[in-house]
Amino acid sequence: MAKGIRHHRVGEAVDGYLLIKTATKQIASNSKPFLTLILGDHTGEIEAKLWGISPEDEATFVNKTIVHIQGDVIDYRGRLQLKIASIRPTSAMDGVHLNDFVRSAPLAPNDMLDEVNQYIFEIHNPHIQRITRFLLKKHQQAFLESPAATKNHHEFMSGLAFHVVSMLRIGKSLIELYPTLDKDLLYAGIILHDLGKVRELSGAIDTTYTLEGKLLGHISIMSNEIAQAAKELEIDGEEVLILQHLILSHHGKGEWGSPKTPVVREAEVLHLIDNIDAKINMMDRALERVQPGEFSERVMALDNRSFYKPSFHKKPIEL
């Protein structure tokens, strides 16, 4: 394909290579099996249906398989879908590689690490700084590679680090506006809040939940890691308890996955920053393929809303 899958619009033909990110077998109303495929490249992903499959198809078109595909982009209930005309698995003769299809953060991993470490250097409370530095160093490589989620926001290679860097920048601006905020707590909370996802999620390709992720979740994982780090570093103080509270409450409410609601000011601010960055990322992704004067496809995680790009934004999409 001359352009990435995320930049295709309704009515356009697709003829190129895509990665099967997920393949889910389902049964149609006529009782015949079919596959729902999530296909992607380094720009994004699109859903497709493979109808009337055989057992051989089911065994062939599986997760992490690169395929050559032809078809057309259609609108299905407000979302883009690829209508498949032909599909085949690739071979060595095609000269394509898995890494070519993995979407990555727009910043280099080492640059993001340098920036995060600079924020850690600005943490003056020795207990908070030591715990934060200890845990980041422990999970450094996974932190730089992991996505921030399986779907919805920052669900790409190095997405976790990019999410953290973006949140730190927001946090710094808020501290300049509200200087009574505890910078040490807020920076540490931002850096650590999703670090448990390096154990909760399987990686950047075909991201799924690990057994530990399903049974415990990243919030409980990181709360426990903070306690263990404090023990190893022989740190005993209220800072440990407050850091754990920031982690346990950063989703805001029980129905959103938090065991506790925020009752420390920096915990509430952490939750708000997390929410802002995640939602802006989702809206940006939805509007990437939209021309001025058009609505995006529906975003399930944002109340199934379609977002409008104002018509006075005349600059065309750069493909």
UniProtKB/Swiss-Prot annotation:
Any one Gene Ontology molecular-function term assigned to this protein's record: 3'-5'-RNA exonuclease activity
Record-annotated DNA-binding residue ranges: 12-90
UniProt keywords, alphabetically: DNA-binding, Exonuclease, Hydrolase, Nuclease
Enzyme type, top EC level: hydrolase
Coiled-coil features, chain-numbered ranges: none
Lineage: superkingdom: Bacteria
Pfam family, one: HD
One GO BP: rRNA 3'-end processing
EC number(s) from the headed UniProt entry: 3.1.-.-
Residue ranges of domain HD in the record: 163-279
Cross-referenced PROSITE patterns: HD
Entry's family note: Belongs to the YhaM family.
HAMAP family with a match to the protein in the record: 3_5_Exoribonuc_YhaM
PANTHER family, alphabetized: 3'-5' EXORIBONUCLEASE YHAM
Protein function: Shows a 3'-5' exoribonuclease activity.
Name of the protein in question: 3'-5' exoribonuclease YhaM
Organism this protein belongs to: Shouchella clausii (strain KSM-K16)
